UniProtKB/Swiss-Prot annotation:
It is an enzyme of class 3 (hydrolase). Mn(2+) 1 binds at residues 137, 166, 170, 259. Its EC number is 3.5.3.8. NCBIfam families: hutG. This is Formimidoylglutamase. InterPro entries: HutG, Ureohydrolase, Ureohydrolase_dom_sf. It holds the Pfam family Arginase. Its cofactor is Mn(2+). It comes from Clostridium tetani (strain Massachusetts / E88). PROSITE patterns: ARGINASE_2. Catalyzes the conversion of N-formimidoyl-L-glutamate to L-glutamate and formamide. Mn(2+) 2 binds at residues 166, 168, 259, 261.
């Protein structure tokens, strides 16, 4: 049981246009989404060809600890609103489920991340692909822990690679038990060291002006890989693709996480730390699709959508389109795309 800080799907968020109530080719996501309550003990594993489960992580405590601009706790609501009208560009054998939200209210960040970990573990055990809606980027720690917990039932030492699209390395120092939205991948490194696991971390879109020299030194010490945003924007992308290939070949599983501050503020103004020289979303989506085609991706999240700063839901809409691209790409991999 996930307790009172888990709230099952609120179907009111899934409202939109209806062109037909019978013709699936005219359906939008709000007509196809099904609620799923992770607190139920009698849930049977999904036996269809391909299923996705959305879960929101309503939290910005990590952002507050990181002295950023709070507001991302409301992100999952607005992302759902933007996803509601997306078209079903897949066959009816692809199923979409909404698993509700983890609410980090009147509990610690660490308790919230533990709840998310349990939720991700359960979603994976149901044979569904988790897509987490943030929430601060502290969502990454809970998502990773859930993936790790699930994979340990298969292999005591799973080989998981992390690909993070982010302007920040997020490997800041932290006090034990007091992480933030800037510490997750250092926390994961410490877990890997403690449990003798492989630590494979690649950060795409790093901004030199957003990280201290000590953080780059720490990344090198930890064996982390990173690609600067300027090298993606102005460099030879084939070199970047080769770097991705080298990284992905060494992994058995890949967890992909996107911090919305990787994007230029022209496309993503509603974030904790906006980036005037961030990446063009078209480039990021191109890389995400390439990574998905490795067929190793086990979980995905997009974080730091902050409605408080998001005039016209521009950033939430971008997050929805990124998620659309993820589902569209995986559906095509399974031969279920239209």
């Amino acid at each position: 049981m996930l307790g009172i800080n888990y709230k099952p799907c609120n179907e009111d968020f899934w409202q939109g246009r209806t062109d037909s109530e019978e013709n699936f080719l005219a359906f939008r996501w709000h007509q196809w989404i099904k609620p799923i309550n992770l607190n139920k003990d009698d849930l049977s594993p999904f036996t269809g060809k391909l299923g996705f489960a959305f879960i929101g992580f309503c939290c910005d405590e990590g952002i507050r600890r990181n002295k950023g601009r709070t507001g991302a706790a409301k992100g999952p609501e607005t992302i759902r609103e933007e996803m509601a009208n997306l078209p079903c560009c897949f066959t009816d054998e692809v199923k979409l489920f909404d698993a509700g939200n983890i609410l980090v209210e009147n509990i610690s960040l660490e308790e919230g991340q533990d709840l998310l970990s349990k939720a991700i573990n359960k979603i994976l055990s149901l044979n569904l692909f988790p897509i987490v809606l943030g929430g601060g980027h502290e969502v990454a720690f809970g998502n990773y822990l859930g993936v790790l917990s699930h994979l340990k039932t298969i292999n005591s030492k799973p080989n998981i690679g992390i690909i993070n699209f982010d302007a920040h390395l997020d490997i800041r120092p932290y006090t034990e038990g007091m992480g933030s939205s800037g510490t997750m991948f250092r926390q994961i490194s410490d877990i890997c060291k403690k449990e003798d696991l492989n630590y494979s971390y690649l950060c795409m879109g790093v901004q030199k002006h957003s990280n201290t020299l000590e953080l780059f030194k720490t990344a090198d010490k930890l064996g982390a890989n990173y690609v600067f945003a300027k090298n993606i924007t102005y460099g030879d992308n084939w070199i970047v693709f080769e770097s991705l290939d080298d990284f992905m070949k060494a992994q058995d599983y890949i967890y992909v996480t996107v911090c919305s501050d990787v994007f230029s503020s022209a496309f993503a103004p509603g974030v904790s730390a906006s980036q005037s020289l961030g990446l063009d979303p078209e480039i990021v989506v191109r890389f995400i699709k390439y990574i998905l085609r490795s067929n190793k991706v086990i979980s995905f999240d997009i974080a730091e959508v902050s409605p408080r700063f998001d005039q016209g839901h521009v950033t939430a809409n971008l997050a929805a389109v990124v998620i659309f691209s993820v589902i569209d790409t995986i559906a095509k991999i399974y031969g279920l795309g239209l």
